[in-house]
Amino acid sequence: MSSTGFAQDREYSAGVQYTNGPLVIAGAYSNVNGLGTSTTGAVTADTAPVVADSERIAGAGIKYAFGPAAVAFVYTYTDIGQPVKNNLVHATLNGSSLRFSNYEINGSYQFTPQFSGMAMYDFTHGDYAASNGTVRPNWNEVGLMGDYLLSKRTDVYMQGVWQHVSGVADDMGGMSGALILGSAGQSSTSSQLLVHVGLRNKF
């Protein structure tokens, strides 16, 4: 298998879900070997957020709906082995491991048949073992969204996300500045705010 690179550039995943009335419980696991290390693998160099030997992600979540409201909690653990590059900010990584523990709680409420609101809080703890020391950054993220139906197919929405990163003494691996995915780029400070306003039409 080594001659074809199958063992190196592969990905496999599995997931389960249990539903009982208003209760939903789910779990998933993903494993990638050769993350972003080639142009033909499961996760190619131009699509991988991080270039590394391996990436393992395990997660579980629970959701409960009651009346017009719903609340959910999600936990994920990511273990990246031998990371060499942070593609999100084009920074070099020289560590032996990069790990993230992510905790999110979110909720939604249907105020009227036309208007719904959503909110979330996310906390991520990182652990990056580098050749010049260990850094343990933390990310705090808060998000709000409102959606209003203009018709069965058309709605207008507004959403905002604020992120703050702490625990990084210097620019280790490009992690000192806040970075919300979907923004124009990384902030030059430890905080970032992103606001979206959109009109959507479903065909």
Segments from the language model and where they lie:
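Aromatic- and glycine-enriched pocket-lining scaffold segments that form the walls
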Residues: 1-19
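Detector for outer-membrane/organellar transmembrane beta-barrel domains
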Residues: 13-148, 159-163, 201
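Short loop/turn motifs that connect adjacent beta-strands in outer-membrane beta-barrel proteins
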Residues: 114, 150-156, 189
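Short proline/glycine-enriched turn/loop segments at secondary-structure junctions
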Residues: 133-134, 185-188
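Outer-membrane beta-barrel "beta-signal"
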Residues: 150, 187-203
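C-terminal beta-signal and adjacent terminal beta-strands/loops
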Residues: 152, 160-178
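Low-complexity, intrinsically disordered Gly/Pro/Thr-rich segments
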Residues: 176-186
